[in-house]
């Protein structure tokens, strides 16, 4: 489906954990290849000079019990680690690989999160909006 997309791809999920390596090892924990497929599709659009965008909507923090930086937040921290490893952390991340080929990958892919805001007792307050799919 990713390979056949003509103009854009929209992904909305609680996590974005995927594999970007060209060849998987038997020891790799993450097996899904969505990020690799996105990488190939974006490169094809870039090389052919086509307008193409990928929109990925994920929450800023996973909706799990616990607090980041504490022993109760281990699951949150693990998910954030794998999200960031997929997106931007390390030479095998999606954005790192795209940056080797494309000067400005943000012309092709963007990562977004939702937040709402209001005034409460005269003070601005904000809250994360969680995506559950």
PLM regions and their residue ranges:
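Active-site cores of enzymes that catalyze phosphoryl transfer or operate on phosphate-rich substrates
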Residues: 1-7
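PLD/PLD-like phosphodiesterase catalytic module centered on the HKD motif
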Residues: 8, 15-133
């Amino acid at each position: 489906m990713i390979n056949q997309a003509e103009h854009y791809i929209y992904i909305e999920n609680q996590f974005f954990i995927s594999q970007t390596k060209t060849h998987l090892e038997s020891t790799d924990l993450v097996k899904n290849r969505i990020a690799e497929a996105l990488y190939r599709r974006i490169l094809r659009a870039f090389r052919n000079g086509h307008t193409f965008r990928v929109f990925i909507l994920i929450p800023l923090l996973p909706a799990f019990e616990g607090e980041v930086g504490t022993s109760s937040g281990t699951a949150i921290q693990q998910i954030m680690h794998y999200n960031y490893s997929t997106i931007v952390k390390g030479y095998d991340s999606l954005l790192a690989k795209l940056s080797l080929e494309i000067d400005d990958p943000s012309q092709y892919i963007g990562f977004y999160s939702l937040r709402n805001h209001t005034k409460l007792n005269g003070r601005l307050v904000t809250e994360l909006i969680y995506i559950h799919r």
